[in-house]
A protein has these predicted regions:
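Short secondary-structure junctions
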Residues: 20-28
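Catalytic-loop of the protein kinase fold
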Residues: 200-202, 207
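Juxta-kinase regulatory segment immediately upstream of eukaryotic protein kinase catalytic domains
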Residues: 1-21
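ATP-binding pocket architecture of kinase catalytic cores
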Residues: 27-182, 190-197
C-alpha cells in the first residue's frame, strides 16, 4: 500500500461526499487477483465502512474496471447481495490509479484449509449459494447496461465468446492440450443455438468469491 493512500483517499472522499471525514483504519485485503482491494473505515458524523478497489498495472486476471462496475450496477436493489456502489473513476491523479468505491458488504470468505468451516449451516448456505446463482441468471438486465456489454460484438454471440476464450487459453498455455483442443473443435462443429434471452452468469465458484455470515 502506498504511504500516501490514506491521505489521498480522505481528501478525495471528503470532497466527494461534501463532508469532513478522518481515516480510522486502512487494511489491505489480500487474495484478489484482478485489483488491489482495501477495507477502509472513516469517521465523520457517522462511521462509514468502505471497500476500495484499485486497478493494478499488472494482475493475474485482466478485467476492465468498467465491466466490473456495470455488473454490480445491474444488481443494485435486487435479491442478489452486491455492495452498494458509490463511485468509479479513471482519473489516475486522484489515488494514483483508476479505482472503484463501494460500501462494505458484510461477510467473510471461508479458508479452504479449515475443516467443516460451514458447519453446522452447510445445507442452508448451499441452498442460498445456488439460489443466488439462479437469481443472477434469471435477472432481466437493464437495456442500457446490456447494450454497453454487447456493443460492437459480432454475431452470433456463442462464436464471439468462444473465440475470445480460445484466444485467452492459447495465450496462457505453455503447451498444447490435446483433450482441450478436441473440446474446442467440437464446440465449433456443434455450436449452441443462439439464445433468445441474454443474461449474466457467474462462472467463478471459488470459495474466496463467496461471503457468509454466522
Amino acid at each position: 500500500m502506498s504511504e500516501e493512500l490514506p491521505s489521498q483517499f480522505i481528501n478525495y472522499f471528503s470532497k466527494f461526499s461534501n463532508k469532513e471525514y478522518s481515516v480510522v483504519n486502512v487494511e489491505r485485503i489480500f487474495g484478489g487477483a484482478s485489483r488491489e482491494t482495501y477495507k477502509i473505515e472513516v469517521k465523520g458524523e457517522t462511521v462509514e465502512r468502505l471497500i476500495l478497489r484499485v486497478t493494478q498495472d499488472s494482475s493475474l486476471i485482466e478485467t476492465e474496471q468498467k465491466t466490473e462496475y456495470l455488473a454490480y450496477s445491474a444488481f443494485q436493489d435486487s435479491k442478489v447481495p452486491v455492495p452498494v456502489l458509490l463511485d468509479m473513476s479513471e482519473d489516475k491523479n486522484i489515488l494514483g490509479a483508476p479505482f472503484m468505491l463501494m460500501k462494505e458488504l458484510e461477510g467473510e470468505a471461508a479458508s479452504p484449509f479449515t475443516p467443516d468451516v460451514y458447519s453446522p449451516n452447510e445445507k442452508e448456505l448451499g441452498k442460498q449459494f445456488w439460489s443466488i446463482l439462479g437469481e443472477i441468471a434469471k435477472k432481466e438486465i437493464n437495456k442500457d447496461i446490456f447494450e454497453t456489454f454487447v456493443k460492437d460484438t459480432p454475431c452470433p454471440g456463442w462464436k464471439n465468446e468462444l473465440d475470445k476464450w480460445v484466444e485467452v487459453i492459447h495465450d496462457d498455455s505453455i503447451s498444447t492440450e490435446p483433450i482441450l483442443e478436441a473440446g474446442i473443435r467440437s464446440l465449433y462443429r456443434n455450436p449452441p443455438k443462439e439464445s433468445k434471452k441474454h443474461s449474466m452468469v457467474h462462472g467463478d465458484y471459488r470459495s474466496g468469491n463467496f461471503l457468509y455470515l454466522d
